[in-house]
Amino acid sequence: MSISLIGVTTGPTGPTGATGATGATGATGATGSSSSVLGINTQTGTTYTLVIGDLNDLVTMSNAGAITLTLPPSVFSANDAINIAQIGAGQVTLAQGAGVTINSTGATATAPKLRAQYSSASIICTASNTFLVVGDIA
């Protein structure tokens, strides 16, 4: 059995409840200066000292003679990294600037060398004036 109501109208729609809080949205920080494009600094001499502009870039070294790459003091901060590559025949040896410590698995841990032409490595600053060298080193 069904019942039908004649003359019944629908009442007004009730008010909508309050919208729940979504929480404050934090401020957006400034855009960083990092780029996804790797810069290349080509060096052709027999000595080079890293500079802050080498940060997050690739320093290539190409010379027929031996090359000394110096890690200077008080330039880089913890978590900074620089990539290096030996393009020429001259073997690249890393040297500690005054007060700098280099750690590596190289035969001379504090003065590692790139193993051969086309070898590469990363230099990572792990603390003030302290660097870890990882890669194709001798």
Segments (PLM) and residue ranges:
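Exposed extracellular interaction/assembly regions and N-terminal maturation sites
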Residues: 31-99, 103, 126-138
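Extended, Lys/Arg-rich, non-catalytic nucleic-acid recognition/anchoring regions
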Residues: 1
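Extracellular disulfide-bonded cysteine-rich modules/repeats
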Residues: 116-126
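Terminal beta-strand-rich extracellular "head" domains
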Residues: 98-115
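Generic low-complexity segments that are intrinsically disordered, proline-rich and/or Lys/Arg-biased
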Residues: 13-16, 73, 97, 113
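Collagen/collagen-like triple-helix recognition
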Residues: 5-35
